[in-house]
Amino acid sequence: IDGWKNLAQEGTRAWWGYEFGDTDESVGEKVAKVTAYDSKVADGDETPVEMMLVTPALDFKNSASKMFTFRVRGDYLMDNQTDTLQLCYIDMEDPDEMYVAPVGGLTMPCTKDESGEWNEYHIDLTGQDLADVFFMGFRFKSIRGREHAATYYIDDVTYGRTDIPVMRPSETQLAFVALVNKDAESAAVTVTTENLAEPVKLTLGGAN
């Protein structure tokens, strides 16, 4: 795909294009695929691998919205697996050094129960201190061989969509001291919304 970069940062294997066959519920869907499984690697000859699939340049300064979305599916996942898939923010403002950092607060499918299921992610970058032009990368780390079968698929990557419902609270956490027989007030909370079909409702739980 034009503008995408496919990097084998450690080892020689990278991502590749894949189309699901007739036996899969996603038959005919074209995706990016990655796995470290290799049946030809003999026991004891396993090697670490790291592959990065990088988006085209994304215009943070001028984009209609700051929403980054994608779908991911993991197959042959195992509880406590060491294979990892991360979404990374990439800044290339310094031509001599590429800055790469995993996006915090985001967990990719990595358990047996999540295997075979598509998951959709909406990452709202509004208010983040990012470069005017940036990149996103899907980084996979594993060990190439017969013991690491985890396989991931990426599809429907978008940036700048304006049709997604969004709620943005001014506060994500509230903390204050409450004393007996004395009123206590939290900081004021405002909520801005986009593309909602229903009114916003507030529910409080616990001993308030």
Tell me what each language-model feature is.
Residues 45-52, 142-160:
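Extracellular carbohydrate recognition
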Residues 44-63, 119-121:
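Short beta-strands within extracellular/lumenal beta-sheet-rich domains
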Residues 1-40:
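Extracellular glycan-recognition surfaces and repeat-rich motifs
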Residues 165-169, 173-175, 195-208:
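Surface-exposed binding patches on compact interaction domains or structured appendages
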Residues 70, 119-149:
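Extracellular beta-strand ligand-recognition surfaces/modules
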